[in-house]
């Protein structure tokens, strides 16, 4: 009998780097061995304009929402929209801050990123996060030579969460989807500075994750083709051929956590440490 992993969507919304949320989400999900989260990380969300696309993404792929947003208006908007969608939302810091306020008899400052020391390392991480968000999913292809790392791979190989994890360590990371039969952007092919690495996984793993990705999605997917194992095998074959042609390294993420994948990438170029 096939031992299938159940996947669920875990949305992590932060007005800072997102490290607190990522740690909390992984600590909680580790207690449920039968289910594995598909992480969607949204750092540096500080106004309504930035938040609205995030809420749409949650509506497209419902799951659990954890957030650390100190702005009360934005936090209320998250809760209201999640209630409308029938999605559980948890303000991770609010119970802790309330306990502090009661004990100390003083209100919190509600200052974004207050836990971070404003040193050069912090600003480098913020710069890397901004770069990574601007260059997610093939955006701004003319800037790839400004990246430290460019991650490529077919859909559902953990490109975005790995990019965010690296950015939280000050590594400017872009990611580009490999689409079967579609040439890669010229900006990538002429880039000389970044480490270019391709993420792959087994056909079964990708099919399972894609099946869970389209749960609740009402449009935008050719469902049968998107999860078809034969089609996925062809996509992987195409990705491997591109990497062989350009001598780009491959990392299999099937049994790797995001942290392990990031460590494997950094190991390919020690100066990133």
From Swiss-Prot:
Pfam families noted in UniProt = Kinase-PPPase
User: For binding ADP, which residues are annotated in this chain's numbering?
Assistant: 153-160
Question: Which GO molecular function, any one, fits this protein according to its record?
Answer: ADP binding
The answer to keyword Kinase applying to this record is yes
| Entry EC number(s) | 2.7.11.32, 2.7.4.27
Q: Which family does it belong to?
A: Belongs to the pyruvate, phosphate/water dikinase regulatory protein family. PDRP subfamily.
Q: What does this protein do?
A: Bifunctional serine/threonine kinase and phosphorylase involved in the regulation of the pyruvate, phosphate dikinase (PPDK) by catalyzing its phosphorylation/dephosphorylation.
What NCBIfam families is this protein classified in?
PRK05339.1
Q: What is this protein's name?
A: Putative pyruvate, phosphate dikinase regulatory protein
Which organism encodes this protein?
A: Rhizobium etli (strain CIAT 652)
């Amino acid at each position: 009998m096939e031992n299938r992993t159940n996947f669920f969507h875990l949305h992590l919304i932060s007005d800072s780097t997102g490290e607190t949320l990522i740690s909390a989400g992984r600590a909680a999900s580790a207690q449920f061995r039968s289910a594995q989260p598909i992480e969607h990380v949204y750092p540096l969300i500080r106004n309504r304009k930035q938040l609205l696309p995030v809420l749409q993404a949650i509506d497209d792929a419902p799951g659990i929402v954890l957030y650390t947003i100190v702005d009360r208006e934005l936090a209320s908007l998250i809760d209201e929209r999640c209630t409308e969608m029938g999605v559980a939302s948890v303000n991770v810091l609010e119970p802790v801050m309330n306990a502090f306020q009661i004990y100390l008899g003083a209100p919190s400052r509600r200052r974004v990123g207050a836990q971070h020391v404003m040193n050069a390392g912090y600003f480098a991480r913020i710069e890397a996060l901004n770069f990574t968000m601007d260059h997610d999913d093939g955006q701004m292809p003319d800037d790839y030579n400004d990246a430290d790392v460019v991650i490529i791979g077919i859909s559902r190989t953990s490109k975005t969460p790995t990019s965010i994890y690296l950015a939280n360590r000050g590594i400017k990371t872009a990611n580009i989807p490999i689409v079967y039969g579609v040439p890669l952007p010229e900006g990538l092919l002429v880039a000389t500075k970044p480490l270019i690495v391709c993420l792959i996984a087994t056909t079964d793993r990708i099919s399972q994750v894609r099946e869970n990705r389209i749960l609740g999605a009402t449009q935008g997917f050719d469902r049968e083709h998107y999860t078809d194992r034969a089609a996925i095998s062809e996509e992987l074959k195409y990705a491997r051929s591109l990497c062989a042609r350009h001598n780009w390294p491959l990392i299999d993420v099937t049994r790797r956590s995001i942290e392990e994948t990031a460590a494997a990438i950094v190991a390919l170029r020690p100066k990133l440490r």
